Amino acid sequence: MKKAWIVDDDEEMMRAVQLMLKLLDCEVRHFFSARPAAQTLLNGERPDLFVLDINMPEVSGIDFLEFIRRRKDFKNIPVVMLSSEATDVMIDRAMALGADAYVTKPVAIEELEEAIKKAFSAHVENQ
Protein backbone atom coordinates (compact mmCIF):
# COMPACT_ATOMS: atom_id res chain seq x y z
CA MET A 1 0.00 0.00 0.00
CA LYS A 2 1.39 3.41 -1.03
CA LYS A 3 1.65 6.15 1.59
CA ALA A 4 0.22 9.48 0.46
CA TRP A 5 0.51 12.75 2.35
CA ILE A 6 -2.08 15.44 1.70
CA VAL A 7 -0.99 18.96 2.61
CA ASP A 8 -4.11 21.14 2.40
CA ASP A 9 -5.66 23.63 4.81
CA ASP A 10 -9.21 23.03 3.53
CA GLU A 11 -10.68 20.28 5.72
CA GLU A 12 -13.61 19.55 3.42
CA MET A 13 -11.36 19.19 0.36
CA MET A 14 -8.89 17.13 2.37
CA ARG A 15 -11.62 14.68 3.33
CA ALA A 16 -12.74 14.31 -0.29
CA VAL A 17 -9.18 13.76 -1.53
CA GLN A 18 -8.48 11.40 1.37
CA LEU A 19 -11.49 9.28 0.39
CA MET A 20 -10.35 9.23 -3.24
CA LEU A 21 -6.84 8.17 -2.25
CA LYS A 22 -8.17 5.40 -0.02
CA LEU A 23 -10.26 4.13 -2.94
CA LEU A 24 -6.99 4.04 -4.89
CA ASP A 25 -5.50 1.85 -2.11
CA CYS A 26 -3.34 4.53 -0.50
CA GLU A 27 -2.64 4.92 3.20
CA VAL A 28 -3.27 8.61 3.84
CA ARG A 29 -1.79 11.13 6.26
CA HIS A 30 -3.00 14.72 6.35
CA PHE A 31 -1.30 17.97 7.30
CA PHE A 32 -3.16 21.28 7.49
CA SER A 33 0.03 23.19 6.66
CA ALA A 34 3.45 22.60 5.15
CA ARG A 35 5.47 23.26 8.33
CA PRO A 36 4.48 20.07 10.20
CA ALA A 37 4.83 18.07 6.98
CA ALA A 38 8.37 19.43 6.52
CA GLN A 39 9.22 18.67 10.15
CA THR A 40 7.91 15.13 9.79
CA LEU A 41 10.11 14.68 6.70
CA LEU A 42 13.13 16.02 8.56
CA ASN A 43 12.37 13.56 11.38
CA GLY A 44 12.78 10.69 8.93
CA GLU A 45 9.26 9.74 7.83
CA ARG A 46 8.62 9.54 4.08
CA PRO A 47 5.52 9.25 1.92
CA ASP A 48 5.40 7.60 -1.48
CA LEU A 49 3.41 10.55 -2.80
CA PHE A 50 2.60 14.16 -1.93
CA VAL A 51 -0.70 15.85 -2.81
CA LEU A 52 -0.15 19.57 -2.21
CA ASP A 53 -2.57 22.47 -2.21
CA ILE A 54 -1.01 25.70 -3.45
CA ASN A 55 -2.77 28.39 -1.43
CA MET A 56 -2.14 27.79 2.26
CA PRO A 57 -1.27 30.08 5.17
CA GLU A 58 2.35 30.42 6.31
CA VAL A 59 4.01 28.26 3.64
CA SER A 60 2.48 27.85 0.18
CA GLY A 61 2.39 24.57 -1.66
CA ILE A 62 4.80 26.08 -4.20
CA ASP A 63 7.29 26.92 -1.44
CA PHE A 64 6.93 23.42 0.00
CA LEU A 65 7.43 21.92 -3.48
CA GLU A 66 10.67 23.92 -3.78
CA PHE A 67 11.78 22.62 -0.36
CA ILE A 68 11.08 19.02 -1.41
CA ARG A 69 12.91 19.34 -4.72
CA ARG A 70 15.99 21.04 -3.18
CA ARG A 71 16.61 18.20 -0.74
CA LYS A 72 18.48 15.22 -2.14
CA ASP A 73 16.68 12.79 0.16
CA PHE A 74 13.18 14.03 -0.80
CA LYS A 75 13.52 15.16 -4.40
CA ASN A 76 12.41 11.87 -5.96
CA ILE A 77 9.09 11.67 -4.10
CA PRO A 78 6.26 12.21 -6.61
CA VAL A 79 4.21 15.39 -6.17
CA VAL A 80 0.69 16.11 -7.38
CA MET A 81 -0.34 19.74 -7.05
CA LEU A 82 -4.03 20.25 -6.30
CA SER A 83 -5.42 23.75 -6.53
CA SER A 84 -8.38 25.88 -7.51
CA GLU A 85 -5.83 28.15 -9.19
CA ALA A 86 -5.96 27.02 -12.82
CA THR A 87 -3.94 29.73 -14.54
CA ASP A 88 -1.33 28.74 -17.10
CA VAL A 89 1.23 30.80 -15.18
CA MET A 90 0.68 28.84 -11.94
CA ILE A 91 0.54 25.47 -13.67
CA ASP A 92 3.73 26.22 -15.63
CA ARG A 93 5.48 27.43 -12.46
CA ALA A 94 4.56 24.30 -10.50
CA MET A 95 5.64 22.01 -13.32
CA ALA A 96 8.91 23.93 -13.80
CA LEU A 97 9.65 23.52 -10.08
CA GLY A 98 9.25 19.76 -10.34
CA ALA A 99 5.59 18.89 -9.82
CA ASP A 100 4.77 15.62 -11.53
CA ALA A 101 1.12 16.50 -12.13
CA TYR A 102 -1.28 19.41 -11.59
CA VAL A 103 -4.99 18.92 -10.90
CA THR A 104 -7.53 21.68 -10.49
CA LYS A 105 -10.28 21.70 -7.87
CA PRO A 106 -12.95 20.45 -7.80
CA VAL A 107 -11.41 17.13 -8.77
CA ALA A 108 -12.98 13.92 -10.04
CA ILE A 109 -11.55 10.60 -8.87
CA GLU A 110 -10.65 9.67 -12.45
CA GLU A 111 -8.65 12.87 -12.85
CA LEU A 112 -6.87 12.36 -9.53
CA GLU A 113 -6.17 8.72 -10.36
CA GLU A 114 -4.64 9.73 -13.71
CA ALA A 115 -2.50 12.40 -12.01
CA ILE A 116 -1.26 9.90 -9.42
CA LYS A 117 -0.38 7.37 -12.11
CA LYS A 118 1.43 10.11 -14.04
CA ALA A 119 3.34 11.15 -10.91
CA PHE A 120 4.41 7.61 -10.07
CA SER A 121 5.38 6.97 -13.70
CA ALA A 122 7.53 10.11 -13.80
CA HIS A 123 9.11 9.09 -10.49
CA VAL A 124 10.07 5.63 -11.78
CA GLU A 125 11.50 7.09 -15.00
CA ASN A 126 13.64 9.57 -13.06
CA GLN A 127 15.27 7.01 -10.75
Regions found by a protein language model. Give the residues of each.
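Two-component/phosphorelay signaling modules centered on CheY-like receiver
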Residues: 11-29
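The feature encodes the CheY-like receiver
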Residues: 14, 57-58, 87, 106
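Residue-level signal for the "D+5" position in two-component response regulator receiver
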Residues: 30, 58-59, 96
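Acidic, metal-coordinating helix/loop segments flanking the phosphotransfer/catalytic sites
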Residues: 30-49
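Active-site residues of response regulator receiver
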Residues: 53, 83
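C-terminal output helix
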Residues: 107-116
